[in-house]
Amino acid sequence: MAFSRAEYILYFAAIALALGIYAFLWRSGFAAGLRNRVRRFSARRLVQAALFVAIFLIAVRALESPLDYYWGFVLEHRYGLSTQGIGSWVADWAKDLGLTVVVAILLAWVFYWLVGRSPRRWWLYFWFASIPITLAFIVVEPYVVEPLFYRFKPLEKTQPALTDRIEKMLGHAGLAIPRSRIYEMDASAKTKIVNAYVSGWGSSKRLVVWDTTLEKLNSDQTLLVVGHEAGHYVLHHIPKEFAFDEMIFLVLFYVGFLAINKIIALSCHSERSEESRHDARLQSEILRFAQNDRIKDVADLASLPIVLIVLTVVVFLASPALNGISRHFEHQADQFGLEVAYGVVSDPNTADVQSFQIMAQEDLEDPNPSPFIRFWLYTHPSTEERIRFAATYRPWAEGKPLELLERPW
């Protein structure tokens, strides 16, 4: 539990640090100065935006790197969760930064183009644009992003008998994932954590089992984990959660639009008031600063730290709603995993309970977090809740229908 509690503290510390960095890069004049430099470098708006975003995000990540290092490397080694060397960790950190910069540049091009075209409705148009962008990322992630960090091989090469059982169980669920897209991931090269997941959508969907899971769980326990992951596809959780989240983000974008404009207006008013209060010598310096560094509207590249401050705050405040939706779907997937394993695993309840116990022990999970932490941070039900449900949900023993397996919608 000590590890989980440290992560809770680090989560809130990371939010505070990010906000502090954005505010510093805004109020110190760094963002405005960088905007002036990229304008002098190129007259092309696309080049200006690309350079500004790349340099700005590299500066942000550099300032965040001590916390990244402590959280992602020191803490996990201290508690015996990581097997990753420092060179590998730094390489992953750099690759993550590179991906972040590339994606951010593409988003910035869309964002600032829409702001320029429609200063009053850019929030709505950017929300529309975010839908195909997010869908495209979901589809290409298994092919482009995941292989940058881990190696994958078909599960049937190392676990043919388990693959046969998985295929039988997936067929029982009516889920068509070819054997060629059921993978084993070499997680043990970096971590001792036990996990499995599904990724992709449509023709890119695939099931991935970590090699640490295969090492720590037996065949029946692994099937319950796989059944849970299969439930996300059969129960259409990906499109459902996507739709719910997009509705929330529509509201967040509008709130963000109002907040960004208000902050910029207040900032300009504050600068003008400051100019009027100082003596002539200081006033001339402030005027020089204001002419070059004042942020007039959101179309200004130097508004990026303000945009990020607002985005961070509104997403943080929306976390309980977003995570509540996720917990609901994760509970459904737990239920589906038990139902689909019935008839394939001799005692699905015992296997499921054991799998949760082992994962909680290996991953150093907090089995029963405080109500506030659960409400604000947890995307899954707590371990205690999941074990309690796994031990008691057995409709087949009571002659009741299998709700989710028979009615996946």
Predicted regions and their residues:
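Polar-ligand-bearing catalytic/cofactor-coordination segments
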Residues: 1-268, 294-298, 312, 316, ...
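Intrinsic disorder/low-complexity segments
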Residues: 265-296
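Multi-pass membrane glycosyltransferase architecture that uses lipid-linked
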Residues: 298-306
